[in-house]
Amino acid sequence: MLPPRRLDLPWSELAANADALEASSSPRFLQRIEASLDQPTHDPYGQPIPTPDGHIESRRDARLRELARPRWAPVRITRVADAPLETLVFLDERHPRPDTRSRIQACTAENDIIKVRSAEWHGTLLPAGAGVLHASLHDEAAR
């Protein structure tokens, strides 16, 4: 996976440039970029990149709000779904990136507002943020 910090770019800028580059580049050029990055298997948002033969890795994850019960559930952020630019900027500033280990501290009855703690950040995610983060249960998540 290519983390946004490897290029020292925020998600919002990375997304805009990646879309433009992909749309305007030849397959050969894109293959060379992938090779120079050691053939990443996931994009910066944690989404699987198809193999040359078209295979896409399946994931066992769920939206964060679907994992919000029980309280204190340890989770590992696996990916960020497509989201509006404002949501990506909000998340980028708070660091809940793929492979981040976190704990769900509290949530509303509808699981749409979730309080999360990780080593890098703790705070509240409103529906826009909680709805685009995907995670899996993890027994070694941050306290």
Residue ranges and their predicted role:
Residues 1-11:
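Conserved segment of winged-helix/HTH DNA-binding domains
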Residues 16, 22-132:
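Mid-protein regulatory/catalytic core that forms ligand/cofactor-binding pockets
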Residues 128-143:
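Short, charged, intrinsically disordered terminal tails
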